Amino acid sequence: RAHFLPPLLLL
């Protein structure tokens, strides 16, 4: 959700 988090968490 947060954009500051690394893309790996989005996966």
Swiss-Prot record:
Tissue-level expression: Expressed by the venom gland.
Keyword annotations of the record: Antimicrobial, Secreted
Localization: Secreted
Cellular component GO terms held in the UniProt record: extracellular region
Protein name, as recorded: U1-poneritoxin-Dq2c
Species annotation: Dinoponera quadriceps
